[in-house]
UniProtKB/Swiss-Prot annotation:
EC number(s) on file: 3.4.19.12
Family statement: Belongs to the MINDY deubiquitinase family. FAM188 subfamily.
Protein purpose: Probable hydrolase that can remove 'Lys-48'-linked conjugated ubiquitin from proteins.
Region (Disordered): 123-179, 198-254, 319-342
Catalytic EC class: hydrolase
Organism: Xenopus tropicalis
Biased composition (Polar residues): 141-152, 165-174
Top-rank taxon: Eukaryota
Protein name (database record): Probable ubiquitin carboxyl-terminal hydrolase MINDY-4
């Protein structure tokens, strides 16, 4: 289990909580202080699948008052399975009546006292990092009338007091080594309740004289009033650490036997063992997450380790650090001891509770975050020092008024124009219709040229990439998101002449005050520009912020701005045949220049090959710029059928059998799943092409069979020939096209 993966899943869980609760300011602060890691989980469905919460999610939906967030669902599940079914319900009631045996001890305390329950929860015990203060890692439970039980009351002698100091347990339930964090033990059986009563009866006199230890602050949580001052707290922290260093491996069974007053009956230890087993069960589920999500990732591993194998590997890796004198040595010993005691029954129970979903495998290379200096352990020190390059932090530069004016002029021809609503609501959102999961959904007309060009690049990675899954057209969420990341990175890198790229992201806050001849549109003013000079860094950065492109709301606009800035406004203007051209034309339609910029990296105005010189007759020569090289994604146009233009071979015969189709002022995609179509002439005799149009509300797959061996005879009186067929015949002259039962698109 990689700690960085657990931390990233946890941070994604927090982001989902903040988003569902509508805490926008907190979310923005979190994004600034804890940026998303590469390949971060950005969708709720993917996060739910990663945590195996599908069953719990469905059960929650059936309740009278369903919980809104996954974090609440997990919390409810864990509390219910830690013996708190009666303590917590959907309405959030948290104050159950205490057991009879403990009520007697509780009544002896002053009514005004505020009791603090402090359970030490270290990274070693939970398997993940917690956001805690610099002086302590504790989980604080504040209660006035809840069940209170002081573990220190049942420890006798100096050695036992030393163990009590190390464990850091002062009240409420048992918190023995290896447990996740069960704060209280809920005694269900009558025999167990009697055992606890006997234990309390024997130690009740010492319970009144025992002074609670000072509480420790958890970041973001206010502590209640305590009897000891802050200075007193600092004095007590020192002995705690020294005791932890000098007392290796306290034994769980021994501590439990002391708590129960020396009674060795199994029934008295059963509640703690049950809580321990449930804690391990939940930890095993978290441990199994990254092991279940490996196949699609760029970083693959060999096999899923069993709990005992995991413990053995950790022990071997920590062998060197165990010999060093450190205040954390005891914690490390407890961690290894806790994992070594984990049996296969816990793992199998976890699998039965939350089944695997192996068809959606995805392991993320994520960012290690929120590790305090005073909390560094051998587990953190053993992380390889060679971190992936995509974890590099990239400094952004806010856009200024002058840049915004230049961009608007190159986009619209005027700084008074703005992005239309069709552009503002459009992102690269995938279709969840099962036969068309690879395709984008277009909400309204306008940015169809950008969508079709990016769609072609996504299909290239999906069908012919290194991790192509046998040309399957029904990718998982993680697969299609990964293909979108690579498509965006390739487009921007190509526009930057394979030397650099600029990624424009929205921060949600204006970076300058509009003035003069400039009209604000709410998008350009909030941009942060990130210049990246390595492709690996670009890929990691796009993966880290893919949610802005995929979920939006300005995904399509941000990509357009990024590709223009990657090419630079000056070079885009030089690519035009006429300097007054623009990238977005009338009615917010994409121009040919914008489509060419995405496909070839140059905003040329024509689709023929290379450059054509026109002699105006007076010795003046006009240069018309076309596509300079063979592209990855091709282009076919209905205008060629009407003899308005001539598409060159660079676009007609691309490296991959994917074409952007321009027909009736609309852009869509045509592709073949067999790459041999571009290299084997025998393949061109009869082959299948697939057509996708994100705007047409397409529900089913459209497969066309093209037969070039037969001859198509056009009927002069028939005006109902589908425009798509005309586009196809600009490349395969006279081919017969069969729609295979699908109604032709007219």
């Amino acid at each position: 289990m990689e700690i960085c993966y657990v931390q990233e899943v946890a941070s994604s869980l927090v982001r989902e909580f903040l988003s569902r609760k509508g805490l926008k300011k907190t979310s923005l602060t979190l994004e600034e202080e804890l940026p998303r890691a590469p390949r971060s989980i950005s969708t709720r469905n993917e996060l739910r699948a990663a945590l195996h919460l599908d069953r719990l999610y469905k059960e929650n939906k059936l309740t009278e008052k369903p919980l809104k967030t996954l974090l609440e669902i997990m919390t409810k599940y864990f509390l219910e399975h830690s013996g708190k079914t009666k303590a917590l319900n959907m309405r959030g009631e948290q104050n159950p009546a205490p057991p009879k045996g403990l009520a007697t001890n509780l009544q002896q305390r002053h009514a005004g006292d505020l009791m603090m329950a402090v359970c030490d929860v270290s990274d070693d015990e939970t398997g993940e990092s917690s956001a805690v203060s610099d002086t302590s890692k504790t989980e604080i439970y504040r209660s006035q009338n809840d069940l209170q039980f002081n573990k220190s009351n049942h420890l006798k002698g100096p050695d036992r007091k030393q163990k009590q100091t190390e464990a850091g347990v002062t009240s409420t339930g048992v918190c023995s080594e290896g447990e996740l964090m069960p704060p209280r033990v809920n005694i269900r059986e009558h025999q167990e309740r009697e055992s606890w009563e006997m234990a309390l009866g024997a130690k009740s006199s010492r319970s009144e004289t025992q002074r609670p230890r000072s509480s420790r602050m958890v970041r973001g949580m206010m502590s209640g009033p305590t009897a000891s001052s802050q200075e007193d707290s600092l004095k007590k922290r020192g002995p705690r650490r020294s005791a932890a260093a000098n007392t290796p491996n306290p034994i769980k069974g021994e501590v439990l036997s002391e708590i129960t007053g020396g009674m060795g009956e199994p029934s008295t230890i059963a509640p703690a063992n049950t809580a321990l087993k449930l804690g391990k069960e939940f930890a095993a589920k978290l441990l199994s997450t990254s092991e279940n999500l490996r196949n699609v990732s760029l970083c693959s591993t060999n096999a899923v380790p069993k709990p005992n194998a995991f413990a053995a590997a950790e022990t071997a890796a920590d062998g060197k650090g165990a010999t060093e004198a450190s205040p954390y040595a005891s914690n490390e010993h407890r961690r290894r001891s806790g994992f070594s005691n984990m049996d296969l029954n816990s793992a199998s129970l976890a699998k039965k509770t939350l089944p695997f979903h192996r068809e959606r495998n995805d392991k993320e290379d994520l960012k290690l975050d929120d590790v305090e200096d005073c909390l560094v352990t051998e587990e953190i020190r053993n992380i390889p020092t060679a971190l992936p390059g995509n974890l590099k932090q990239i400094e952004g530069k806010p856009i200024d008024l002058a840049q915004a004016v230049e961009i608007k002029k190159i986009l619209f021809g005027s700084s008074f124009c703005c992005f239309s609503d069709e552009w503002k609501i459009q992102s690269f959102t995938f279709n969840n219709n099962q036969p068309l999961r690879y395709g984008f959904i277009q909400k309204k007309g306008g940015p169809c040229g950008v969508l079709a060009a990016v769609q072609g690049c996504v299909l290239k990675n999906l069908l012919f990439g290194k991790d192509a899954d046998l040309r399957v057209l029904q990718p998982s969420d993680s697969q299609r998101t990964s293909c979108l990341c690579k498509a965006i990175a390739d487009i921007l890198w190509r526009a930057g002449d394979n030397k650099e790229a600029v990624v424009a992201l929205s921060c949600g806050r204006p970076q300058f005050s509009p003035a003069g001849r400039y009209k604000a549109d709410g998008i350009l003013e909030s941009l942060i520009l990130y210049k990246i000079r390595k492709y690996e860094d670009l890929m990691g950065f796009v993966q880290q912020h893919i949610s802005q492109f995929e979920l939006g709301p300005f995904g399509c606009t941000l990509l357009t701005l990024s590709v223009v800035l990657s090419r630079s406004v000056e070079l885009v203007q030089k690519d035009f045949d006429v300097s007054t051209n623009c990238l977005i034309g009338a009615h917010s339609y994409c121009t040919q220049e914008l489509v060419n910029l995405i496909l070839s990296g140059r905003a040329v105005s024509n689709v023929f090959n290379d450059v054509v010189e026109l002699d105006s007759g007076n010795g003046n020569i006009t240069l018309l710029r076309g596509v300079a090289h063979r592209t990855d994604i091709g282009f076919l146009s209905l205008f060629e059928h009407y003899n308005v233009c001539q598409v060159g071979s660079y676009l007609k015969t691309p490296r991959f059998p994917i074409w952007v189709i321009c027909s009736e002022s609309h852009f869509s995609v045509l592709f073949c799943v067999r790459r041999e179509l571009m290299s084997d002439w025998k393949m061109e005799r009869r082959f299948d092409l697939y057509y996708y149009d994100g705007l047409a509300n397409q529900q089913d797959e459209i497969r066309l069979t093209v037969d070039t061996a037969a001859t198509y005879i056009e009927e002069q009186e028939n005006d109902l020939t589908p425009p798509l067929e005309h586009c196809i015949r600009t490349k395969w002259k006279g081919a017969v096209i069969d729609w295979n039962g699908t109604e032709p698109i007219l």
